[in-house]
Amino acid sequence: MAGTATYEAQPSPTPADQNSHDLFSYETTYTFDSDFQESKLGHGNSLYNDFSYDHRFLITGKWYLRLGVEYERYDFDGTDNGLPDKLQAVYGHIAFEYVVKDFPGIGIELDPGVYYQEHISGDNFDIPIKAFVSFPLKKDKIFAVVGLGWSLFQDPPVAPGGGIIWVFSDKLRLQAVFPKPALIYEPNDDWQLKLLGELNYLGVRTDDVVSPTEHKLDLHNAVLQYSEYRAGVQIGYTGIKHLKLIAGAGCTIERDFDFFRAHQSKRTDPAPYVRVAAEVKF
């Protein structure tokens, strides 16, 4: 005689994790030659390279611990005016984030490392900190972003950031968020077009600066905040699984060597730039 059928309640399936866990990125940006605003400093150009790798560890829900490493470097060529010929930084990433479909909505990040010119010492150590939170102003359409950053080698040491994200449609959105605002158009799943502005900067402690033309730049272990203000166009291609290829060009409006503690700032005229970059996520 057949037994009575029994049923066991099955636990509901765990929602699939829609976020990438391994994140690689590489960028190189070349700014062509332009004159310094003080003619006695001559002219110069810059080459920027950046590599980073991060891994996200799921904590619970959509909260993650992200750990990684990054190397940044600027190389400068042109007139021998005593300004640094390179700036470098090697640092870690320690971040706690709330992530939805690979977009962090809340986060705090520490970047402990050495920020230097040529030689590494204890004086080069810094722990920049940045934190942000985003929240909806109009559901699925308009979002506000509020951020704050701190670093020993920047002026001011505490600086605000943030702005507005406005989603006009599935294909067009405005990310008016400082320091990298952009208007983004995505005609399909494979292509992305950006009109962008950006402030890219790095604060370091330099070696001795000795200038043959500007003795106010004769400085010992000075703190330098180097900045590039850019505006341009960028194209991204994501038709290859896990890979995004990026090419861009535009104008570096100004490059600024700011020895803010010595009250010396040396700026350049505008010059064109070109960029190639790649991102891998899986």
Predicted regions and their residues:
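Membrane-embedded beta-strand positions in outer-membrane beta-barrel channels/transporters
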Residues: 46-52, 89-95, 128-132, 143, ...
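Solvent-exposed loop/turn segments connecting transmembrane beta-strands
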Residues: 40-45, 84-86, 117-125, 149-158, ...
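Transmembrane beta-barrel strands of outer-membrane/channel proteins
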Residues: 24-32, 67-73, 108-114, 146-150, ...
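Outer-membrane beta-barrel translocator/channel fold
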Residues: 71-82, 179-253, 258-265, 272-274
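Repeated loop/turn-to-beta-strand initiation elements of outer-membrane beta-barrel proteins
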Residues: 59-65, 102-108, 140-145, 171-174, ...
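Outer-membrane beta-barrel strand-turn architecture
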Residues: 18, 55-61, 98-104, 135-139, ...
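Outer-membrane beta-barrel "beta-signal"
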Residues: 162-165, 171, 233-241, 268-282
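Transmembrane beta-barrel domains of bacterial outer-membrane proteins
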Residues: 4-122, 126, 221-230, 263
